[in-house]
Swiss-Prot record:
UniProt organism field: Mus musculus (Mouse)
Domain N-acetyltransferase: 635-779
Keyword Zinc: no
SUPFAM superfamilies on file: Acyl-CoA N-acyltransferases (Nat)
PTM-bearing positions, type N6-acetyllysine: K230, K291
Low complexity bias: start-end ranges: 314-334
GO BP field: G2/M transition of mitotic cell cycle; regulation of cell cycle; regulation of cell division; regulation of DNA-templated transcription; regulation of embryonic development; regulation of transcription by RNA polymerase II
Descriptive protein name: Cysteine-rich protein 2-binding protein
Biased composition regions of type Basic and acidic residues, renumbered to the chain: 255-275, 402-423, 443-452
Gene designation: Kat14
Region (Disordered) location: 1-34, 247-292, 314-345, 360-457
Protein's UniProt keywords contain Transcription: no
Matches recorded under Gene3D superfamilies: 3.40.630.30, 3.90.980.20
Disruption phenotype: Early embryonic lethality. Severe growth retardation, increased apoptosis, and alterations in the cell cycle.
Length: 779
């Protein structure tokens, strides 16, 4: 009975092996000077089958995967060379689904009659696939996708000891996980960047776990013939620029070296054709001098009058292929040094393609040294090739990449200037019109649909003004010798002083726009490409990858400290509000829910300020034995209202930094809490609910120093967390803020230490700590 089962099992495995490729290589983690590298290392214990049958369905349903696992999961005995189904084992070896990576000895072969097993050394790709498969069975994630760091890395860290044993956990092990995802895309892993519009989401292409096959299991001759006739996917993951151990024969190495040399010679032929094309164009434009840019740049032609003929705008002929015949998804039109430019350039040209009437793609002009750099791994974004037919879109993106660079021009001597002026008067107009007609004739039809270019000049942000002033102050000698630098420094100082005093700044564009709008309203809307900033609005650019949520609350003209409207009565200025109907419910514009007037009314809490007030009252009536203190007013927790904003802004400018305006929080009052004593605001907290999918961000949380140590901040954090059930809550806290301990009590964990996070907000003379911790509360 056992022999028949064993024979049928071997036959079924041989049939399955016809559709998969064996591999004994996996990704391992290594560190060189603090950087995590991906090393291709052979595994002696076991190999993983990562290539599934491409002809069938992708099996994205969890139910189908569970049934597949119940049929396929078995353990291989090293001694009797049999596969033992998981249902026949006496005990469960792994609590993870699809995990059979053990050196197993069945009870019949063991000396003591007990099953023996030992964890095999897993590769990083096996670990990542096991983690993603088990996450998919749990039903979490978003449409089958999981976040790279928050889900996949968290799962691996939770089961680190069980999966990886006593392997050392380095400080950058998560970057190895990111490398596995990027390198394995799109064969084994699929990115959700295109579906969700943000990087970091990944899923398995085939929702199956990796399959272990012992090294000693041999294939039948018929199976090998089928495998040789059927094209299979190469499961060996290679990154251009990473070293591989010599595992191929000398013949294959020699063939690869010959192919590489042919590509190098081909690139030289292309550059030679480029020079010949330049000579032909030079002869056709007899009196128009042409200047070429250095090798490695796009071959633009610069005319004397500044007219630039950009070869990237010319349409390619039918002889120049726009799609690569190799497995590469598309041509490389990116600039040298970008991750996409490190891929190997395929052989694209034949003898007919070397005709110099049309320039070949710019990716072929790079030197061979540039193409053999180390592969750069993007931890969260998958390369998505553009549509095959949109040639103008590719060329347009190329132009955008090269736009900021300066074009090298030669300076003519004084003797050549008169001759050039004479030549300009006779020949320039005809030459420019000739080249303009030629370029318009060769324009592709899809270029009309391209988006208009942005403005050439953009206003300098407040933070950039601060950095510029700091650089000028660091070079007093150079500034003293240059009148222009002294004038610029004085302008920056005056602008900064006006902002500190709340005075308006002169903006010529704003004045001209106001005059045009005053004459005719349609004048301001004619120029759709140059949209200017509105009055009182600043531009804050961030240098870090994460989007600064705090930037949306910044204004260019902070109000003066103590500023109030002149029409406000003194009584309302004293009590803090002129809204008499405070006990009425409001409707949230964000969720359309009816919000009650109060979240909570606390009669028990006695902050230090209230204790001092009660002592003052009792001291006044200390000689009256019949005096009894009256009931104290409660602390009212309520949602933000428009009348709260001026006081909250002034408190933010006093305790945080200038220029904060929280008027935007009125759009989502559900995610706010304001604490009042009678009509005096003593604390507040705000949360942004729409930072990312499944993530909210606490932007501001403040308790007045005289009202602290009474549990007010604890209740505010609890309330904000409860308003976003099921979402992660994130925040930034200053490195010197003792509230870090309070956040840790709620379960917030430190994810990142951000240097100079508050540098763009604090004034230059501020002594506050400008570094911050980024905390996250996972749900």
């Amino acid at each position: 009975m056992d022999s028949s089962i064993h024979l049928s099992g071997l036959l079924s495995r041989h049939d399955d092996d016809a559709t998969r490729t064996s591999t004994s290589e996996g990704l391992e983690e290594g560190e060189v000077e603090g950087e995590t590298l991906l090393i291709v290392e052979s595994e002696d214990q076991a190999s993983v089958d990562l290539s599934h049958d491409q002809s069938g369905d992708s099996l994205n349903s969890d139910e189908g995967d569970v049934s597949w696992m119940e049929e396929q999961l078995s353990y291989f005995c090293d001694k009797c060379q049999k596969w033992i189904p998981a249902s026949q084992l006496r005990e469960q070896l792994s609590y993870l689904k699809g995990d059979n990576f053990f050196r197993f000895t069945c009870c019949d072969c063991s000396a003591d009659g007990k099953e023996q097993y030992e964890r095999l050394k897993l590769t990083w790709q096996q670990v990542v696939m096991l983690a993603m498969y088990n996450l998919s069975l749990e039903g979490s994630g978003r449409q089958g996708y999981f976040r790279w760091k928050e889900d996949i890395c968290a799962f691996i860290e939770k089961h680190w000891t069980f999966l990886l044993g006593n392997r050392k956990k380095t400080s950058t092990w998560w970057s190895t996980v990111a490398g596995c995802l990027s390198v394995g895309s799109p064969v084994y892993f699929r990115s959700g960047a295109q579906e969700f519009g943000e990087p970091g989401w990944w899923k398995l292409v085939h929702n199956r776990p990796p399959t272990m096959r012992p090294e000693g299991e041999k294939l039948a001759a018929s199976t090998l013939k089928v495998k040789a006739s059927k094209p299979t996917l190469d499961p060996i993951i290679t990154v251009e620029g990473l070293r591989k151990r010599a595992s191929r024969n000398p013949v294959e190495s020699a063939m690869e070296l010959k192919e590489k040399r042919s590509r190098t010679q081909e690139a030289k032929d292309i550059r030679r054709a480029q020079k010949e094309a330049a000579g032909l164009l030079d002869r056709s434009t007899s009196s128009t001098p042409v200047k070429f840019i250095s090798r490695g740049r796009r071959p633009d032609l610069i005319l004397e009058k500044g007219e630039v003929i950009d070869f990237s705008s010319l349409s390619s002929s039918d002889r120049t292929p726009l799609t690569s015949p190799s497995p590469s998804p598309s041509l490389d039109f990116s600039a040298p040094g970008t991750p996409a430019s490190h891929s190997a350039t395929p052989s694209l040209l034949s003898e007919a393609d070397l005709i110099p009437d049309v320039m070949p793609p710019q990716a072929l002009f790079h030197d061979d040294d540039e193409l053999e750099g180390d592969g750069v791994i993007d931890p969260g974004m998958e390369y998505i090739p553009p549509p095959a037919g949109s040639a103008s879109g590719l060329l347009g993106s190329r132009k955008k990449v090269r736009a900021p660079e300066q074009i090298k021009q030669e300076v003519d001597s004084e003797e050549e200037k008169p001759d050039r002026m004479d030549g300009d008067s006779e020949d320039t107009d005809s030459n420019i019109s000739l080249h303009t007609r030629a370029r318009e004739k060769r324009k592709p039809p899809l270029e009309k649909d391209m988006k208009p270019k942005g403005p050439r000049y953009t206003p300098v942000s407040i933070y950039e003004e601060k950095l510029l002033l700091k650089r000028l102050e660091a070079c007093p000698g150079a500034v003293a010798m240059t009148p222009e630098a002294r004038r610029l420094k004085r302008k920056l100082i005056v602008r900064q002083a006006k902002r500190d005093r709340g005075l308006p700044l002169f903006d010529l564009d704003e004045v001209v726009n106001a005059a045009l709008l005053l004459v005719d309203g349609i004048y301001g809307a004619k120029d759709g490409g140059a949209s200017r900033l509105a009055a009182g609005q600043a531009t804050y650019r961030t240098t870090c990858q994460d989007f600064r949520i705090l930037d949306r609350y910044q204004t260019a003209l902070p109000a003066r400290k103590g500023f109030r409207h002149q029409t406000t009565r003194f009584l309302y200025r004293l009590v803090g509000s002129e809204d008499l109907a405070v006990d009425q419910s409001i409707i949230s514009p964000y969720t359309s829910r009816i919000l009650k007037p109060y979240i909570r009314r606390d009669y028990e809490t006695k902050p230090p300020k209230l204790q001092l007030l009660s002592q003052i009252r009792s001291h006044l009536h200390r000689s009256d034995p019949h005096w009894t203190p009256g009931p104290d007013a409660p602390l009212d927790y309520c949602y933000v209202r428009p009348n709260h904003i001026p006081t909250i802004n002034s408190m933010c400018q006093e305790f945080f930094w200038p220029g904060i305006d929280l008027s935007e929080c009125l759009q989502y009052p559900d995610f706010s809490v304001v604490v009042l004593y009678k009509k005096v605001i003593v604390a507040f907290g705000f949360m942004v609910p729409d930072v990312k999918y499944n993530e909210a961000y606490i932007s501001f949380l403040l308790v007045h120093p005289e009202w602290r140590r009474a549990g007010i901040a604890t209740f505010m954090i609890y309330h904000l967390i409860q308003t976003c059930m099921g979402k992660d809550v994130t925040l930034h806290v200053s490195a010197s803020n003792p509230a870090m301990l309070l956040y840790q009590k709620f379960g917030f964990k430190t994810e990142e230490y951000v240097l100079d996070f508050y540098d763009k907000y604090y004034p230059l003379e501020s002594t506050e700590c400008k570094h911050a911790f980024f905390l996250r509360l996972r749900r």
